[in-house]
């Protein structure tokens, strides 16, 4: 089963879609919320000279006038150059069955779904009257370790998606259609050159390297170094101090000629790094345990004095 992400409060969560999951003859009323929010800094485009904000106007190339959103429709140009115009009324009349429903089509093993298909992630919240059937679907998927494959229409577009349990909620992942996935077309897949041949000994050594780099996945161990450096730069600009110095780039060792030798050195480095990480983790664990004991002892002394 796919590991569940940590679920917490996301500021500004708002309903993005409202409808029902069609689960056999049972309808489960739900609301859809974006499960993610990027932490990137939001920049404005400004004029270098006077720092005035830059605005982009919607201008018609035919009449040269600025156009309001209400006067903008969609246009599709056919292969022979004809322009087919569609407005919101045309799109609303499309005979789409899943307009206000999440149509559950089938349930499949998670390992059969290639992650390449996944797009965005959403939380599903049950309507108050649908909590029991919501929990039933959640527990059924959890017990069978399956993903529900569904169709949903969002922003006037029908989308394939999957639903899975994550903690106490159901999570929906929108997906690409098969014809939206590009096939890799690389020369090395078809060339007859021998530069893709590897020996059993090299595969064994590469496997050893992978095994020595294997850990339990904890996303909190990783940091966005770019955003941290950007925060330091903005802070320095605000205070009028020197910006942080750029970290030196790692030395480029050039093309690897002795692949086996490079693998052996990599395995040694991975073992050393793994031992160091374990010592650091154990030390941090001991500090937390010691801190907890001190807090407990302090509370006990306080209770005794009381």
From Swiss-Prot:
SUPFAM superfamilies: SPOC domain-like. Transmembrane segments: none annotated. Keywords: DNA damage, DNA recombination, DNA repair, DNA-binding. The gene is ku2. Pfam families: Ku (PF02735). Residues 291-300 have a biased composition (Basic and acidic residues). Belongs to the prokaryotic Ku family. Residues 233-306 are annotated as: Disordered. The lineage of its organism: Bacteria, Bacillati, Actinomycetota, Actinomycetes, Pseudonocardiales. Residues 21-206 form the Ku domain. InterPro entries: Ku70/Ku80_beta-barrel_dom, Prok_Ku, SPOC-like_C_dom_sf. This is Non-homologous end joining protein Ku 2. It comes from Saccharopolyspora erythraea (strain ATCC 11635 / DSM 40517 / JCM 4748 / NBRC 13426 / NCIMB 8594 / NRRL 2338). Homodimer. Interacts with LigD. With LigD forms a non-homologous end joining (NHEJ) DNA repair enzyme, which repairs dsDNA breaks with reduced fidelity. Binds linear dsDNA with 5'- and 3'- overhangs but not closed circular dsDNA nor ssDNA. Recruits and stimulates the ligase activity of LigD. GO terms for molecular function: double-stranded DNA binding. Residues 274-290 have a biased composition (Basic residues). One of its GO terms (biological process) is double-strand break repair via nonhomologous end joining.
């Amino acid at each position: 089963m796919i590991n569940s992400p940590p679920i917490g409060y996301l500021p500004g969560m708002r309903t993005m879609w409202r409808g029902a999951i069609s689960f056999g003859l049972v309808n489960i009323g739900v609301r859809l919320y974006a499960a993610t929010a990027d932490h990137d800094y939001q920049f404005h485009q400004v004029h270098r000279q006077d720092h005035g904000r830059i605005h982009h106007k919607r201008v018609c190339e035919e009449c040269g006038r600025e156009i309001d959103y209400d006067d903008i429709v969609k246009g599709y140009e056919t292969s022979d150059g004809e322009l087919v115009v569609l407005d919101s009324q045309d799109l609303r009349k499309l005979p789409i069955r899943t307009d206000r429903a999440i149509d559950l089509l089938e349930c499949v093993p998670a390992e059969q779904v290639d992650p390449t298909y996944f797009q965005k992630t959403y939380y599903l919240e049950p309507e108050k009257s649908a909590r029991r059937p919501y929990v039933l679907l959640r527990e059924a998927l959890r017990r069978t370790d399956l993903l529900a494959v569904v169709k949903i229409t969002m922003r006037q577009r029908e989308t394939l998606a999957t639903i899975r349990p994550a903690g106490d909620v159901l999570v929906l992942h929108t997906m690409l259609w098969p014809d939206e996935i590009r096939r890799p077309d690389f020369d090395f897949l078809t060339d007859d050159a021998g530069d893709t041949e590897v020996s059993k000994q090299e595969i064994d050594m590469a496997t050893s390297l992978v095994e020595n780099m294997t850990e339990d996945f904890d996303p909190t161990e990783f940091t966005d170094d770019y955003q941290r450096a950007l925060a330091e730069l903005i802070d320095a600009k605000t205070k009028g101090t020197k910006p942080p110095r750029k970290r030196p780039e790692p030395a480029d060792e050039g093309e690897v000629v002795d692949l086996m030798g490079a693998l052996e050195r990599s395995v040694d480095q991975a073992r050393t790094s793994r031992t160091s990480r374990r010592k650091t983790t154990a030390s941090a664990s001991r500090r937390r345990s010691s801190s907890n004991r001190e807090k407990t002892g302090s509370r006990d002394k306080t209770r005794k004095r009381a």
